[in-house]
A protein has these predicted regions:
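Alpha-helical segment of the N-proximal tetratricopeptide repeat
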Residues: 32-58, 62, 239
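Start-of-helix register in tetratricopeptide repeats
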Residues: 34, 68, 102-105, 145, ...
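Residue-level recognition of tetratricopeptide repeat
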Residues: 41, 75, 112, 152, ...
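Register position in tetratricopeptide repeats
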Residues: 45-46, 79-80, 116, 149, ...
Length: 313
């Protein structure tokens, strides 16, 4: 993936980070969403993925060129562990997209499909197209988000060098936003320190990791991005986990966003390291039910399902 300048978004969308912009053009989104989307989201919240897939496929019988329906069907299939079948729908969405923006959304969905399989290289390949699209419209903030999204998939799959590169691209590109305000600058600096700390922890360099944690905290203490506060205990727990300090890791992770499937999975892994298999399985079960189509779910859902299958009940 080359950085051609002309990601988390850190939100957890119902089923697809790629689909959301298609359905979020105005404040009255809820009223404007197609009925099949509302119904499908409800089915997924109830854990009825098979029924949601049937609904989306039924929609595609009458509207085969619907980009939202193709992305939605593919997203459900990824959650069900059927990536190869999912990518047929994403390929269709890319093919029939009638605007560059919609094509980029479909390509982003394709990139996340590969993320569910831990395939950093293919994720990056498709995120590059999305990155280039946002560069063409000079949306530097969104370019940075997409670069961070690719980097997140790569760190989770263990490709630390590629992750470092794309986190740096995200940071540097995001800062190119014209007339960028200080809070936005602080956001990119915080994300960059957060990323460097995690990568250092994964490499076993605890001193460097702690240095970046300290810097990240100083940025947060400025108070310019209070919504990012939830990501500090996540970071501290992450660093402690890879240092083998599992009690500290658990204490910190339990302060993080408990609805984040990645955090749920890490808490499960920490309980497992501490020898509490029952608590580990409890959190793996939570993580396995995620219905987002984004990097946290792409990491958590497959791993949690494998853990549940391998651990004695």
């Amino acid at each position: 993936m080359k950085a051609t300048v002309a990601l988390i978004p850190q939100t957890f969308l119902v089923f697809s980070a790629s689909l959301a912009p298609l359905l979020a053009q105005t404040p009255s989104t809820q009223q404007q969403q197609p009925e099949f989307v509302r119904q499908g989201q409800q089915l997924m919240r109830e854990g009825k993925l098979d029924d949601a897939l049937v609904l989306y496929r039924k929609t595609l019988q009458t509207s085969p060129y619907s980009v939202p329906a193709n992305i939605a069907a593919g997203s459900v299939l990824d959650l069900m562990g059927q990536g190869e079948e999912a990518r047929k729908y994403f390929a269709k969405a890319i093919d029939v997209a009638d605007t560059p923006e919609r094509k980029a959304m479909a390509q982003r969905a394709m990139s996340m499909s590969y993320a569910f399989e831990g395939n950093c290289k293919k994720t990056v390949e498709y995120e590059q197209h999305v990155f280039d699209y946002y560069g063409s419209v000079r949306n530097f903030f969104q370019q940075g988000e997409i670069a961070d999204e690719a980097a997140r998939t790569c760190i989770d799959s263990g490709d630390l060098d590629t992750a470092y590169h794309w986190y740096q691209v995200g940071h540097d590109t995001g800062l190119k936003e014209p007339e960028i305000k200080p809070p936005r600058q602080d956001l990119w600096e915080f994300r960059w320190e957060h990323a460097q700390a995690r990568i250092a922890a994964r490499r076993g360099n605890q001193a460097d990791a702690q240095k970046h944690v300290t810097t990240a905290k100083k940025i947060l203490d400025k108070g310019t991005n209070p919504e990012q506060a939830q990501f500090l205990p996540y970071l501290q727990g992450y660093v402690a986990f890879y240092a083998g300090n599992y009690k500290t890791a658990l204490e910190e992770l339990l302060k993080a966003n408990q609805n984040d499937p990645f955090i749920q999975c890490m808490i499960g892994q920490t309980h497992e390291k501490l020898g509490d298999k029952d608590k580990a399985i409890e959190f793996y079960h939570k993580a396995s039910t995620a219905i987002a189509h984004n990097p946290p779910a792409a990491y958590a859902v497959p791993l949690a399902k494998k853990k549940i299958a391998s651990l004695p009940s």
